[in-house]
Amino acid sequence: MDLDIEDCKRAFRQKLDYGQIDEIIDACHQRGIYGELEEGLLSADEFRSIVLAGSRPGATAEDVNEAMSHILVGIEPYKVQLLKELSQEYDLYMLSNNNPICLPYSAGMFEQAGIPLEKIFRKCFFSYQMKALKPSPVFYKAVINEIGLPSEEMLFIDDSRKNVDGAIAAGLPAIYYEPGTDLAALLHAALKKEEVC
């Protein structure tokens, strides 16, 4: 799922006139109340109430939801095809720093792309449900334990170097995907290397 932090910030400013957006969302998008929402420490209603208290008069909970949805761009068609192909050969799991406001939007984007989350992924691990954020070792260790395979039989891919470093520190093999590069080539090379070992 591709993200657009700046569009999300713009939506918070335009729809809500919310002045603290730069304090809670950045390239890692997990600070302050946003981080608490994604870690499951704040409910969606609590988050919306806090945001609305700092927004223009007349702003609504739906305005908050709409502004939040602007962080999500969608899934590139080649990535959709890649996920379909990989799911035929491997068990796929999603590890996502996510929240109960954005999840319905992102799940809808997967559905529209023809790859519903429950069909393409064996299981999804969402930070707000796990009460832990990537790159915390707690997050990765819980995932490893729940999947039940030796960690060396797994491969974690992320577009955040911090998340990759956190996974490696927790004993999970991981590779960094630089947004805008060819994910398919990176994955195929990594999987080929694993088969040789």
Briefly describe each language-model feature range.
Residues 1-29, 53-54, 169-170:
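Active-site neighborhood of HAD-like aspartate-dependent phosphohydrolases
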Residues 7-11, 32, 46, 50, ...:
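Alpha-helical elements of Rossmann-like donor-binding domains used by nucleotide-donor carbohydrate transfer enzymes
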Residues 21, 76-80, 137:
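Structural motif corresponding to alpha-helix initiation and N-cap regions
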Residues 32-36, 102-104:
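A short acidic, helix-capping loop that chelates divalent metal ions and anchors anionic groups
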Residues 34-65:
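A metal-dependent, Asp-based hydrolase signature
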Residues 61-110:
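Substrate-recognition element of Asp-dependent hydrolases with the DxDx(T/V) motif
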Residues 99-100, 104-197:
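Asp-based, Mg2+/Mn2+-dependent phosphohydrolase catalytic module
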